[in-house]
């Protein structure tokens, strides 16, 4: 499951956990960035998660692959939901969040994009003071949403899986979580 910063992915996933509990659906959510951050620490890099993308691209690539393998090794009788991004803006340019070798390690059954309108994304980014972001313009939000769809399309082709898009409109995160759970349940 992926979404650009500002779509409300974290909020939707928190709500997804609550809805799944209510409906007695067993699922486990793993944040790809959290796993990467733990691995960076093992490499002696105790950095803020917003600074991971500023690290040497070779180190990022190694850690990204290690994170995918670690996530794949999680044995769970629950449905595994991987919280990630389709792309990352690094110092070297736009980098795929799930390049081919990472995608192969994760072996997804489905790709879900959480989206919101570009105006909402830009507004949420500006309001979120907990994150370190370079720019928060409407044009940036539009471009990021487009890049996310481009990358998701490539991933779907490579993995041979469908894409679903869930809208997270302002004030409707519960509806987005319910939509997401319906999609997850349809895979069973």
Regions found by a protein language model. Give the residues of each.
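Walker A/P-loop
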Residues: 10
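ATP-dependent small-molecule kinase phosphotransfer cores
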Residues: 28-96
């Amino acid at each position: 499951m992926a979404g650009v910063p500002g779509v409300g992915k974290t909020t939707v996933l928190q709500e997804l956990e609550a809805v799944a509990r209510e409906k007695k659906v067993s699922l486990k959510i793993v944040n790809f960035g959290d796993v990467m951050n733990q691995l960076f620490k093992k490499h002696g890099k105790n950095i803020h998660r917003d600074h991971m993308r500023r690290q040497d691209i070779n180190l990022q690539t190694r850690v990204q692959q290690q994170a995918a393998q670690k996530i794949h090794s999680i044995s769970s009788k629950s449905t595994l939901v991987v919280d990630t991004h389709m792309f990352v803006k690094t110092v070297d340019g736009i980098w795929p969040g799930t390049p081919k070798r990472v995608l192969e390690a994760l072996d997804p059954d489905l790709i879900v994009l959480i989206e919101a309108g570009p105006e909402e994304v830009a507004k949420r980014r500006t309001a979120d003071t907990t994150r370190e972001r370079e720019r928060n313009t409407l044009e940036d939000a539009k471009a990021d949403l487009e890049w996310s769809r481009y990358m998701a399309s490539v991933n779907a082709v490579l993995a041979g899986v469908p894409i679903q898009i869930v809208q997270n409109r302002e004030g409707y995160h519960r509806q987005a979580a319910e939509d997401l759970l319906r999609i997850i349940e349809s895979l069973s």
